[in-house]
From Swiss-Prot:
GO MF: porin activity; protein transmembrane transporter activity
GO terms (BP aspect): monoatomic ion transport; protein secretion by the type V secretion system
Gene, per the UniProt record: hxuB
InterPro entries to which the protein is assigned, alphabetical: Hemolysn_activator_HlyB_C, Polypept-transport_assoc_ShlB, POTRA, TPS_OM_transporter
Pfam (any one): POTRA_2
Localization, UniProt: Cell outer membrane
Family to which this protein belongs: Belongs to the TPS (TC 1.B.20) family.
Name under which the protein is recorded: Heme/hemopexin transporter protein HuxB
Lineage per the UniProt record: Bacteria, Pseudomonadati, Pseudomonadota, Gammaproteobacteria, Pasteurellales
Superkingdom of the organism of origin: Bacteria
Signal peptide: 1-26
Biological role stated in the UniProt entry: Likely functions in the release of soluble HxuA from the cell.
């Protein structure tokens, strides 16, 4: 008789575990994969904007005295000479010279001709090119013009930072030192890439060289903020591990002098049911600003709420490495290429029913991302990536309890895209619109699924409300910027989000009563009060416009506060 209550408890737990394992989609039970995806949302970095025009070297016409009756003469030939008085082939100037040769010209006309030649070369990448009318005697209508394209003279470095002189030299050797002339695109690329190095501020200064037609380059580098840290709190956590999350982190730049960066982030939920630690170290490895990095991530969780009786918990270890290369750097266009490898060990268990599942995932991702100042006062952002993955799946569940589509080994491919545009409007207004999505070739493990909810998705739903194999998200936002105090900005916004997708790529094993598709949409408003580099307070409220998620909240209130040091 004493054994019956014990048997009843175990039988109930096993029955509950079986029902829950078959109803993950409906109840949305978090696991290591989905929780890692939720944490990835908070690590999304602001997209880098192109800097805009760096050098504006329009040639100015020299002052020429104007007379009522200027002396004119027939121009029969124009000889273009370099700084060594050697004649230069002028085929590329034919469209300019035809407007003067064979006509009567004055000194003012010749001055305009020299200025047009200067403009032509400056518009064709010769940053400091200049055409000059030297003193001369004009014979038989032949005029000589001295063309100085701007040879590279002395390159000097004033380095008052922790950045290595050798690295700066290697970077200059792949840009400004690749030509005998000061080329605008190479100088711009050098300026942009060296200012991309974390922890330094760099400036360039051109001056006249010792020889005729030469320009000296002075590179000034100073330390920016080498050490920084932050603390933050938000309510973006999962209701089963704790809604409120406390995070802290630190970043150190230029530890070795090669533009390296060390980042450490720690996070815990208010109930300590979710703990996460992440470290990321990267360094520049060549004169082309290619960056190599390694990452490590640890997560541990314990579920409460409806899953507390199952004693559900789990942990994951992630190790990764990546290569990031600035493929194109111009003032109005940025393109980066990234190749990354990631190894994941994921473990989930329900101790009450002694069920444990382990997954090992190896993945290789190849992608590009960039931004483009295509429209005046507007920036377009884009990214494309393809992930090739291999999954090794282990479970101690009995065969009749396991999912019908369970496979111990599988390969999968995931395609992601993102396209958005930010447009500045008059009166301190702005409008943002964006679309992003994911395609897959087969049903995915939870760590590879796309989250339709959360702050990076449909903001009227929690992040774990819907995770899909294939999905698409459209977001629009109307903003207003109001300067407050000396350096703070108050941003108010109205937004609309719409997302849709399929829970499973392959739905053959699903019961006919199970709905495989989902659509979410919401509207909301937000306020952000911030001082760049000091603090930020973000508040938003969003209301769902659908009833496609069972037991969904009537609205979502999002709050985050961060203080940087």
């Amino acid at each position: 008789m004493k054994m019956r209550p014990r048997y009843s408890v175990i039988a109930s737990a096993v029955s509950l575990g079986f029902v829950l394992s078959k109803s993950v989609m409906a109840l949305g039970q978090p696991d290591t994969g989905s929780l890692n995806r939720e944490l990835e949302q908070r690590r999304i970095q602001p997209e880098a904007k192109p800097s805009g025009e760096l050098f504006n070297q329009a040639a100015k016409s020299p002052y020429t005295a104007q007379y009522k009756q200027e002396l004119k003469f027939p121009l029969t030939q124009v000889q273009i000479l370099d700084r060594n008085n050697q004649e230069v082939v002028t085929d590329e100037l034919a469209h300019i010279l035809k407007n003067y040769v064979g006509k009567e010209v004055s000194l003012s006309d010749l001055s305009n001709l020299a200025n047009e030649i200067s403009e032509f070369y400056r518009n064709n990448n010769y940053l400091v090119a200049k055409a000059i009318l030297p003193p001369q005697e004009i014979e038989q209508g032949t005029v000589k013009i001295l063309l100085l394209k701007g040879n590279v003279g002395e390159i000097r470095l004033q380095n008052h930072s922790a950045l290595s002189n050798k690295f700066v030299s290697r970077l200059s050797n792949t840009t400004v030192n690749t030509s005998e002339f000061i080329l605008k695109d190479e100088l711009e690329k050098f300026a942009l890439t060296i200012n991309d190095v974390p922890g330094v501020n760099a400036g360039l200064q051109l001056s006249a060289g010792k020889k005729v037609g030469e320009a000296n380059l002075l590179i000034k580098i100073n330390d920016a903020k080498r050490f920084s840290s932050y603390v933050s709190v938000d309510n973006q956590g999962n209701k089963y591990t704790g809604r409120y999350r406390l995070a802290a982190g630190t970043k150190v730049n230029n530890l070795t002098g090669w533009g390296d960066e060390l980042k450490l982030d720690l996070l815990s939920s208010n109930q300590a049911n979710l703990k996460n630690a992440r470290i990321d170290y990267s360094s520049l490895i060549d004169g082309y600003s290619t960056r190599f990095g390694v990452t490590a991530n640890y997560l541990h969780y314990k579920l409460g709420g409806n899953f507390k009786s199952l004693q559900s918990q789990g942990h994951s270890h992630n190790l990764g490495a990546y290569l990031l290369h600035p493929t194109i750097r111009t003032p109005n266009f940025r393109l980066s290429t990234k190749v990354s490898f990631n190894h994941q060990n994921l473990t989930d268990e329900q101790q009450a029913v002694t069920v444990k599942q382990k997954r090992k995932i190896n993945s290789l991702t190849v992608g590009i991302d960039g931004s483009w100042n295509l429209i005046k006062d507007g920036t377009t952002y884009f990214s494309l990536s393809t992930l090739f993955g291999n999954l090794a799946n282990q479970t101690n569940e009995k065969k009749h309890n396991a999912k019908e589509d369970f496979q111990p080994q599988s390969h999968f491919t995931v395609y992601n895209y993102r396209l958005s545009h930010e447009q500045i409007l008059p009166k301190s207004f702005a409008f943002n619109i964006g679309i992003n999505g994911q395609f897959a070739d087969k049903t995915l493990e939870s760590s590879q699924k796309m989250l339709l909810g959360g702050l990076s998705g449909v903001r009227g739903h929690q992040a774990g409300a819907a995770s899909v194999d294939e999905g698409h998200l459209i977001q629009t936002e109307f903003k207003h910027y109001l300067p407050v105090f000396s350096q703070s900005v108050l941003v108010s916004s109205l937004f609309y989000d719409y997302g849709f997708g399929k829970y499973y790529k392959n739905s053959q094993s699903l019961a006919q009563s199970v709905k495989n598709s989902v659509k979410l949409q919401s509207v909301g408003a937000g306020l952000s009060f911030s001082d760049a580099g000091s603090y930020a307070i973000n508040v938003s409220v969003a209301k769902p416009l659908d009833n496609n998620i069972d037991n969904a909240d009537k609205h979502q209130f999002w709050l985050s506060m961060i203080k940087t040091f």
